Each structure stands twice: as C-alpha cells, then as structure tokens.
Design a protein with these regions (language model features):
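Flavin (primarily FAD) cofactor-binding/catalytic cores of flavoenzymes
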Residues: 1-321
Length: 323
C-alpha cells in the first residue's frame, strides 16, 4: 500500500489484511504476551488506522485446534434435511426451508457440548446480533469473546455454534440457493442472513483477531461508524465491490449493454448454466466468479470443491473438440 508513515488512515471493515500490511508489514512486531500478543511499533506504521463500518459489527474468530471438532456424523441428519428440499428448487423459502435447519443444527451442537439450547434461542440471538449497531466497546467485547471461545479458553457459545453449523452445511446451502433456487421474493432474506454469517462463520483466524485486538487496545486501530473520513486522512477502500459494480468501461459492462449476457433481476448477477455458459445471451461465452454472485452463491470461497462450473465447462470443451 502506498501510504506514508504516520498519517491517519481510514479503511473499510473487511480491512484486516490492509491493517496487517500497514503494521506488521512495515516491520512492526507482535511478541508473546499474556492474554494477547504485545505489539512493538516500528515507527513506519500510520499514526492511527480508523476502520469504518456502518453496523459496527465485527468479524468473529475462526476456531483453532484447541476446540475439539464435532464428528462429521453429527451433521448428517441436517444435511439430509437440506437434501430433502432439493425437489422444491425454485420454490424454496429461505427461513422456512433452510435457515431453520441451520439453527436446529447449531442448537443441537451446543446441547451436545453441555449447554441446553433450542433453535429459538439461536434465532433470538441472531436477531439481536443483526438488528442493532455496535459501538467500539461492544465490538471489542464480541471479538474478545470469540477469540476466547476459538482458543478453548471459554466454552462454545451460540455465535460459535451457529458459525460452525453454517460452515459445515454451506455446500448444501450453495446448491439449494444457486441457479434460482429460492422462490420469488426470498433472495433478500437469504442475502441479509448470508451477509451477517460472513462475519460469524468466515471471519479471520483467531491469531489475526488477537493481533487486531492488541492494535485496538494500543490505539493504533479504532472503529468508527462515521462514513466521512477526517480531513487529511489517507483513505483505503478495503471493501470488495458487489457483483453489480462492474467498471462502466470494462468488458463486462459492454457485454451487458449489447445483450450478450443476461442479468438476473433479483440478484443483479450474470445468469449462467452449471457449466458457466451465459443464459439468454451469446453462445460460446462463459462467465465465472464474482460477476455471477447471487445467481451462483459463494464465489469468494477459498474452497476448490464448492463449485463445479469450471470443471463442467472444461468437460463441454473437451467433448466439442474430440466429439
């Protein structure tokens, strides 16, 4: 990042990589401490990094090896419950058909660990989490709680169990929702939940959360729900653009304008087949990745097995070439 030493820097909440580049990447050091690592400044980092987020809700820590995982057999009944929804693809109601299974799985995993919990308890916690803004103190408490749970210092709690259930069942969620699996008017409900579950289930490693907490305690990083950066600040946009924010002068926008690709009106994503070929547009054109997000769910994943479109496309090309 081309940011000089000692200015004030402001960035989006998906900014942990940028924060680490501006601190640890500039010869700052994290050393072993008691509960959290200590940070030794190099003098090359910004004076202060302000992270802007409208909701104030933070990313929570992923579990470490210190938390004993639930055996894969435990999740099978919930996978079966989701598979039972497959015949209704195109008519699925997100809360009734999918979200209720996730909450039941989370409650059962908590009960198995010794904390009697119902799916209603899980749903009420999630409503409370997603409904209100968090100030910096509340966000720090949530992060610290998630770090302690992820490292085995505290017993697992509802956000941990809910994140675990979402991760374990995510491949089936992707199958059910992708390619227009939800009924009319249901995508917004899914999108709102999925956005929050990114924070709860797919947050940074616990080690990174600990580093961020230390930087916050030392005043290097602060959280803000204000949208305007202070005068003179260097602004880093660390938020991934949405699928509908294609460069107006780029090739994708031109393809849309010419009608070579078709945009799904509900998700604003490019509509494609299971082999990536565009629907309702030019034959022989395939699109993969974030431009299809919403029509195809979960393109930002690091998993190589979650989506099969590229392999399917390669198979169709091989057939065309070799008969």
């Amino acid at each position: 990042l081309c940011v000089p030493a000692n200015p004030n820097v402001t960035s989006g909440w998906n900014a942990i990589d940028a924060i680490m580049m501006l601190t640890e990447g500039r010869d700052g050091r994290f050393e072993s401490g008691d509960a959290l690592p200590d940070y030794v400044r190099s003098g090359n980092e910004p004076k202060q990094i302000t992270v802007h987020c409208r909701s104030g809700r933070p990313m929570l820590a992923k579990p470490t090896a210190k938390v004993e995982p639930i055996t894969d057999v435990f999740w099978e009944p919930y996978r079966e419950a989701l598979r039972a929804c497959e015949p209704n693809h195109g008519m699925l109601k997100f809360h009734k058909d999918i979200w209720c299974v996730i909450c039941e799985a989370a409650a059962a995993s908590l009960s198995q660990s010794g904390t009697d919990t119902t799916s209603r308890d899980v749903e009420e916690w999630f409503r409370g989490w997603s409904r209100y803004k968090m100030d910096e103190a509340a966000a720090r408490r949530a992060m610290l709680q998630s770090y302690d749970v992820a490292t085995g210092v505290r017993p697992i709690d509802i956000p941990f169990a809910l994140g675990d259930a979402w991760r374990r069942l995510y491949p089936l969620i992707v199958e059910l929702v992708s390619f227009g699996g939800l009924a009319a008017g249901q995508y917004k409900a899914f999108q709102q939940v999925a956005m929050e579950m990114e924070r709860i289930a797919f947050g940074p490693p616990a080690e990174s959360v600990a580093k961020l907490l230390r930087l916050m305690r030392d005043g290097v990083v602060q959280l803000s729900d204000q949208t305007d950066a202070p005068e003179g600040a260097v602004v880093v946009n660390a938020v991934i653009a949405s699928p509908s924010q294609a460069d107006e002068t780029g090739p994708l926008s031109q393809l849309i304008l010419r009608g070579d690709v078709e945009v799904d009106p509900l998700t604003q994503a490019i509509r494609v087949s299971d082999s990536g070929n565009v629907l309702g547009g030019r034959k022989g054109l395939a699109v993969f990745g974030r431009a299809t997000e919403g029509w195809v769910v979960g393109n930002d994943t690091l998993s190589r097995t979650l989506h099969s479109q590229i392999q399917n496309w390669a198979g169709t090309i091989a057939v065309e070439m070799h008969g």
